[in-house]
From Swiss-Prot:
Its main location: Golgi. Residues 1-6 are cytoplasmic. Its cofactor is a divalent metal cation. Glycans are attached at residue 449. This is Alpha-1,3-mannosyl-glycoprotein 4-beta-N-acetylglucosaminyltransferase A. The lineage of its organism: Eukaryota, Metazoa, Chordata, Craniata, Vertebrata. The chain crosses the membrane at residues 7-27. It comes from Rattus norvegicus (Rat). Keywords: Coiled coil, Glycoprotein, Glycosyltransferase, Golgi apparatus, Membrane, Metal-binding, Phosphoprotein, Secreted, Signal-anchor, Transferase, Transmembrane, Transmembrane helix. N-glycosylated. Glycosyltransferase that catalyze the transfer of GlcNAc from UDP-GlcNAc to the GlcNAcbeta1-2Manalpha1-3 arm of the core structure of N-linked glycans through a beta1-4 linkage and participates in the production of tri- and tetra-antennary N-linked sugar chains. Involved in glucose transport by mediating SLC2A2/GLUT2 glycosylation, thereby controlling cell-surface expression of SLC2A2 in pancreatic beta cells. Inhibited by UDP.
Length: 526
């Protein structure tokens, strides 16, 4: 009897375990499918946004043409052809400066903006376009190795969702055709499938680069090199802008990390509700800088206005300054505003490996120090804010860097009364918050006995629950949460919005140091 009961009990345990495992597996699969659907929805949303932008452009152009035809038809039907011709020749409409204003020599040849060489199937409608400019190098070319690194680290389905455009910035057609021949031999399958395209500009695209003004202490040769480089970037961007949702600028002497494509795409989709302009996946120069396709027209136009004046990375920073910086505010305020348009992903996904520069005689031992670093902080886009703390910072791991996604915050032993303050530049409607302390190298350096508090813009007539009202402090802040096991997260009572500031308050002395490696103050999305 005991044996039978034991057998029944064993069977019940087995059945229960099996059902539990089956339920968990089903739940986990369902969760993964939901995440996948959410990503696909965000991707579709981005495609629709880009399509809407392009349709709007085409609609405006077509409307202008239709109006001209209607007017011409009406005038002709009234037997006023001569009068119409006189009007057209005597009256000139106001003109907005175009590419021909900045590069007037292009008017001398109607093919100046058409690739002299174009290899590939012309794939469009992808998520990411990767642009790689390359020129003749005196010592060694790294192009083949770069392409192998990019292509070999793509999964089959990813190869269908991107296009790699190699821009050969040379007008010597013999050299261009020799590069094309090498690429066709090495990557014939990728070219025929549409994954890889190769283009080169016509000789008439370039202006006279012999009499450029020497600036910033650069030699005449370097000024010519950087000026031509700006023009190369512009041609490549103009060619790429109609092909996909995002455009990422690469170089011909890099290697990449595994799973780079999926990482880039998911990071961009996570930020789809934010008004970013540049996502950075490398800290070096122009490598790994990604734009949204509709923004490329603005980038190209700005570069062409100043292509002879400054290098590309300086010009990019000027674009951001023009867009968001207030001349009446200080540099810190400007940096905070720019940080919302220029968002850095860490660790870097691209590493520079070229030793010999495309500039003749230049040796450059540039490497991205973040390429092999473990991820010690998690990056989010937070509302622009002035940050401050009473805590003693350790070795330059400042709160400002953490809030801007550059580094984790590390402070020496917190004591009762210490605080961390985030004062928003403008009041913000906040949906939720997340603060995570400690990291994988120092998991014990966490915030303990610390509360989360918010300061509403309006302290009176708040439509909030009695429970929330009871958490009001003497200085007008409301205590809405606390750290548990090093983490504080929660939903903000909508009645408290808009919020002027967040504050983390230490209420008891701590026995350990504190690291803050994740800050996410999530705005309400419209």
């Amino acid at each position: 009897m005991r044996l039978r009961n034991g057998t029944v009990a064993t069977a019940l345990v087995f059945v229960t375990s099996f059902l539990t495992l089956s339920w968990y597996t089903t739940w986990q699969n369902g969760k993964e499918k939901l995440i996948a659907y959410q990503r696909e929805f965000l991707a579709l949303k981005e495609r629709l946004r880009v399509a809407e932008h392009r349709i709007s452009q085409r609609s405006s152009e077509l409307n202008t043409i239709v109006q001209q035809f209607r007017r011409a038809g009406a005038e002709t039907n009234g037997n006023n052809t001569i009068k119409l011709l006189k009007e057209l020749t005597s009256k000139k409409s106001l003109q907005v400066p175009s590419i021909y204003y900045h590069l007037p020599h292009l008017l001398q040849n109607e093919r100046s903006l058409q690739p002299a060489v174009q290899i590939g199937s012309g794939r469009t409608g992808v998520s990411i376009v990767m642009g790689i400019p390359t020129v003749k190098r005196e010592v060694k070319s790294y192009l083949i190795e770069t392409l192998h690194s990019l292509i070999d680290n793509l999964y089959p389905e990813e190869k269908l969702d991107c296009v790699i455009v190699v821009f050969i910035g040379e007008t010597d057609l013999d050299y261009v055709h020799s590069v094309v021949a090498n690429l066709e031999k090495e990557f014939s399958r990728e070219i025929s499938s549409g994954l890889l395209e190769v283009i080169s500009p016509p000789e008439s695209y370039y202006p006279d680069l012999t009499n450029l003004k020497e600036t910033f202490g650069d030699s005449k040769e370097r000024v010519r090199w950087r000026t031509k480089q700006n023009l190369d970037y512009c041609f490549l961007m103009m060619y790429a802008q109609e092909k996909g949702i995002y455009y990422i600028q690469l170089e011909d002497d890099i290697i990449v990390k595994q799973n780079y494509f999926n990482t880039i795409k998911n990071f961009a989709l996570q930020l789809s509700s934010e008004e970013w302009m540049i996502l950075e996946f490398s800290q070096l120069g122009f490598i790994g800088k990604m734009f949204q396709a509709p923004d490329l027209a603005l980038v190209v136009e700005f570069i062409l206005m100043f292509y002879k004046e400054k290098p590309i990375d300086w010009l990019l920073d000027h674009i951001l300054w023009v867009k968001v910086c207030n001349p009446e505010k200080d540099a810190k305020h400007c940096d905070r505003q720019k940080a919302n348009l220029r968002i850095r992903f860490r660790p870097s996904l691209f590493q520079h490996v070229g030793l010999h520069s495309s500039l003749s005689g230049k040796i450059q031992k540039l490497t991205d120090k973040d390429y092999m670093k473990p991820l010690l902080l998690k990056i989010h886009v937070n509302p622009p804010a002035e940050v401050s703390t009473s805590l003693k910072v350790y070795q330059g791991h400042t709160l400002e860097k953490t809030y801007m996604g550059e580094d984790f915050f590390w402070a020496i032993t917190p004591t009762a009364g210490d605080y961390i303050l985030f004062k928003f530049d403008k009041p913000v409607n906040v949906e939720s918050y997340l603060f995570h302390s400690g990291n994988q190298e120092h998991p014990g350096d966490i915030l303990l006995n610390t509360t989360v508090e918010v300061l509403p813009l309006k302290s009176d007539s708040l439509e909030i629950s009695k429970e929330t009202k009871d958490k009001r402090l003497e200085d007008g802040y409301f205590r809405i949460g606390k750290f548990e096991y090093g983490v504080a997260e929660g939903i903000v009572d909508p009645g408290l919005n808009p919020i002027s500031a967040f504050r983390l308050s230490v209420i008891q002395n701590s026995a350990v140091w504190a690291i803050l490696n994740e800050i996410h103050i999530k705005k309400v999305t419209s």
